[in-house]
Amino acid sequence: MNDRELGCAGGQFMDRGRMNQNGVVQPLLTDLYQITMAYAYWKSDKTDDTAVFDLFFRNNPFHGEFTIFAGLEECLKFLDSFHYSQSDIEYLKQTLPEGIEHEFFEYLGNLTARDVTLYAIDEGTVAFPRVPIIKIEGPLIIVQLLETTLLTLVNYASLMATNAARYRMVAGKHVKLLEFGLRRAQGPDGGLSASKYSYTGGFDGTSNVLAGKLFNIPVKGTHAHAYITSFSSIGELKTRLIKHKQTGILEDLLEHAVRHRALLSHLLDVSTEESSEGELAAMVSYAIAFPDGFMALVDTYDVKRSGLLNFSAVALALNDLGYHALGIRIDSGDLAYLSCLARETFEKVAERFKVPWFNKLTIVASNDINEDTILSLNEQGHKIDCFGIGTHLVTCQRQPALGCVYKLVEINGQPRIKLSQDVEKVTMPGNKNAYRLYSADGHALIDLLQKVSEPPPAVGQKVLCRHPFQESKRAYVIPSHVESLYKVYWKSGKICQQLPTLEQVREKVQISLKTLRNDHKRTLNPTPYKVAVSDNLYNFIHDLWLQNAPIGELS
């Protein structure tokens, strides 16, 4: 096929400014054995061999039945920049075993990914075990050298996007989700990747300022407990004045807040003497700094007896001067109970002081939240509008790695298979195409792998789908729609598709998830999604298996 037939006409070169967002991703970000294998291939005169590798995973993460594919754009950036610098070559000369021929280093210095072709499913698409999410064709040595880096770029990205998508599903579409995990992430790059791919998976924003700049993700945040505890009395307020939003006249915000606090103490049955004066001072100070964006942490001392009283007083004071507060954050305690208490408080204030917008104040909850926490809060009838989630999200608490693998399936047109006593680790040989078959109601029924030489399944035509390793498991499927999963994304040194924005990938995730039946997505005991092979590929796999499996001998 030529470039035009592959959709590569004209190509798309990677923006070099975008390419260098992470300078760590380079050819030396690999395992040593990739380079020693490359030398052995070179010594064996295999530089002209053409290979096909499949990048796939064997099991879905988090005890679920789907995975979100992410990281493709980063893989394309890596291919675009793939080149060993002179300093790389000098380092390898010092590091590799003695006796490596000088010509090999010259060979490495001239390597690029120009002769590589990369096929992939669209980033943001739901993917399933054994179906390759990336397929790489090209010179054996080059595609071997790509292995570790591609796995690094796909494994965490897909795991993170999947984790975020699961949080989105349990939280519901009307609750905001914010990623607060930078300080708990596995290093700076882990923090950036977590912010990027949590947004991909369905989160609404991040606290990570650099991620906001690099990826155009909405940046959100309030303040820490330290801000509240840095004040101990109202006497510490250096300024109390703020301009009225409409008139521009300077007014004493503290004076308004103190007056409202006295009235609120009767309404809420809370003594002003029990509430923290330092907390009130801190909230007044913060409100003066951000009168249109006032959101306060209310659990520094006592949510009921201090935080809600002081917040409501300052919010009403801002209202006197033409401003509307945004809401509160609760970072400890019984989140279900406290959120209900806060909502009840706001409703009382709205009615008593004739401020209907108080009913719409946002309640943000944080504090080591995970999937199970949200499910429990849902059962308790919480009133939380937004979750700030950090540690368990970015560290993927329930499963720290996805386990993608990169396996040789064909060389010089000849299929290759890896055998194992563990059937799960037997590879599916040969160059393959993948199709997703849909029912009449638009739900995905099954993913089907075929040899590239086979014609694609046809709409309305019966297709025999077989389990790749269990002979008795087979079924006829009559698809109402057939989707070819692979597109050529890289060929002849060019990107062959218009790359989507992060926002478009994020939308793709939700669209793709909607194609799955609810029983595939449920948290408890989800129904496994079926992945099958064609009858032709089934016979091909098992014939090759028998050809390569040693025959035992008993005596």
Swiss-Prot record:
Residue ranges the record marks as coiled coil: none
EC number(s) given by UniProt: 6.3.4.21
Protein name: Nicotinate phosphoribosyltransferase
GO molecular function: metal ion binding; nicotinate phosphoribosyltransferase activity; transferase activity
UniProt key word Metal-binding: yes
Annotated binding of nicotinate, by residue: 33, 180, 222
SUPFAM superfamilies: Nicotinate/Quinolinate PRTase C-terminal domain-like, Nicotinate/Quinolinate PRTase N-terminal domain-like
Zinc listed as a keyword: no
Taxonomic source organism: Drosophila melanogaster
